[in-house]
């Protein structure tokens, strides 16, 4: 029998596994897809680096940028100062998984296709066999199987869409985020050392018509000579109402973390910081033999900040307000997720 099973080996699940091993608990990670690239730009903010200093010393290729640019819907360009790290998500996710395994976690490269609770235990079924675990952690993304089983799926209205390309060459020096004049979302151009990530996101699936075309037109206009080496599309949580979090994200023997919990900045789409925070807090709750306490821990740690951003998002993406917001950013040295 498995003591603690983590479904999902992305940043939330892998970091949680590593934290658990430091408390003498050696979990099993189930994931058949990670590591993988994503249209996510792989940016790590200065706040994330401050809270998790190991990020500054990860021995994988990355970029370090002291500034980045915002472009408003009307085309006004604003330079902001911040200390940003840029990672390939393939390499970043792989590092976190390897780190956890080296500390004693187990990785099973199988997809969990069904879950069933029997008494005080969970039965996890893969295509090969059935596993039994005492504690279950759902870190399996926006379409989380674990979430669907314990509290139900994230509502479609609370899901956004990203699409992106990876170009295997250094195209630009600067990070640039361009607010879309056509939808609630933005485009990005992010240098990542040997390659460059181009992407676009919308905060609402219902607003995703023409998403790929908008990115293609932007690239054709500004970078007509690049070669798109690969492409991705992915769903992301984008919670529209703080009351969504009135439902517990942890119970007597289960916890939801990261994207599965809906913990993503609803304005910027930043998820890595929340993934690491959730991984740390979930491991703390389990180490205290009280998985349910995760509800209290995450709410106290950053809940009010997240709720505030959810409320701000309602009016921020109105074009006149967004233009004003971009202007107020002038002179700000650091932004926090």
Set out the residue ranges of the language-model regions.
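Glycine-rich FAD pyrophosphate-binding loop
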Residues: 5-9, 18-40
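Active-site flanking residues adjacent to catalytic metal/cofactor-binding acidic residues
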Residues: 7, 30, 139, 257-258
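Predominantly flavin-linked oxidoreductase catalytic cores and closely associated redox partners
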Residues: 9, 99-229, 246, 262
């Amino acid at each position: 029998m498995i003591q603690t099973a983590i479904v999902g080996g992305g940043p939330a699940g892998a970091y949680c596994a590593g934290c658990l091993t430091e408390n003498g608990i050696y979990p099993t990670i189930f994931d058949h897809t990670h590591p993988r690239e994503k249209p996510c730009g792989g940016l790590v903010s200065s706040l994330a680096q401050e809270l998790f200093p190991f990020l500054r010393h990860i021995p994988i290729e990355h970029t370090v940028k002291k500034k980045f640019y915002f472009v408003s819907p009307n085309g006004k360009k604003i330079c902001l100062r911040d200390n940003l790290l840029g990672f390939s998500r393939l390499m970043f996710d792989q590092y976190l998984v390897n780190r956890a395994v080296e500390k004693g976690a187990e990785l099973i490269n199988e997809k969990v296709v069904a879950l069933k609770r029997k008494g005080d235990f969970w039965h996890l079924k893969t295509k090969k066999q059935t596993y039994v675990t005492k504690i279950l952690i759902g870190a399996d993304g926006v379409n989380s199987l674990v979430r669907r089983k314990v509290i139900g799926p994230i509502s479609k209205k609370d899901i956004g869409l990203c699409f992106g390309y990876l170009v295997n060459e250094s195209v630009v020096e600067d990070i640039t985020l361009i607010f879309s004049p056509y939808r609630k979302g933005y485009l990005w151009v992010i240098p990542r050392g040997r390659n460059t990530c181009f992407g676009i996101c919308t905060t609402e699936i219902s607003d995703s018509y023409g998403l790929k075309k908008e990115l293609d037109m932007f690239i054709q206009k500004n970078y007509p000579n690049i070669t798109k080496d690969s492409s991705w599309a992915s769903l992301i949580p984008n919670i529209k109402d703080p009351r969504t979090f009135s439902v517990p994200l942890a119970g007597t023997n289960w916890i939801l973390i990261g994207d599965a919990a809906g913990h993503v900045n609803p304005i910027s789409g930043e998820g890595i910081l929340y993934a690491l925070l959730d991984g740390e807090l979930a491991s703390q709750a389990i180490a205290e033999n009280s998985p349910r306490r995760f509800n209290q821990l995450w709410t106290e740690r950053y809940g009010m900040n997240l709720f505030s951003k959810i409320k701000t998002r309602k009016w921020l993406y109105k074009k006149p307000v967004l233009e004003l917001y971009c202007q107020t950013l002038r002179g700000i040295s650091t932004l926090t997720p």
